Amino acid sequence: VNDFGDLNIDESLISSHDGQTISLANGCVCCSISNDFNQTMINLVKRIEQFDQVVVEASGVSEPERIMDIARLDPELSPSGIVVLVDAAEVQNNSTNSYISNTVLKQLQTAELLIVNKTDLVSKEKLAELEAWLEGLSPNAIQLKTSGGLIPAELIFGEKINDNFFYSKP
């Protein structure tokens, strides 16, 4: 669990926390706490027989490509792809916000899977415009439209379709 601030709010919201969740607070995985992240990944590799995959859910201000670069440092890890959750109603506004635009655009451009969420909150015309806009930013990314954040688990834990990403059609 990675929170940007001093308080690890997300960790406290996870009701099934069983001691197997690793918390990283007070910074972005790819920036100020990257050493903690590196050590955490090394520790996970040592326990690799306990699980098949590790999913890193980074904060909204993270740089996914830098996280992948960190994971690529260890020869025992094989990073499998960058998934970005897109708010269909807000992403274009966020992409022009002077505080977060660079981060938003970089996340979209490095994605291999764009999960376009909240599609029920935009018109069909807006959705078609958004789809074309995303295609221009990330032409090689797979786009999946959904609402309520509902996606099949196979999208994250599915079969490998190329050297970088696992995906199974629902």
Segments predicted by a language model, with ranges:
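Nucleotide-state-sensitive switch-loop elements of NTP-binding domains
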Residues: 1-102
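Short internal beta-strands
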Residues: 1-2, 115-117
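Short glycine-centered, acidic/aromatic-flanked micro-motifs in structured strand/loop junctions
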Residues: 58, 117-118
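Non-catalytic interfacial helical region
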Residues: 66-71, 89-104, 108, 114-116, ...
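Well-ordered beta-strand positions
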Residues: 81, 112-113
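C-terminal accessory "lid"/substrate-recognition subdomains
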Residues: 106, 110, 121-170
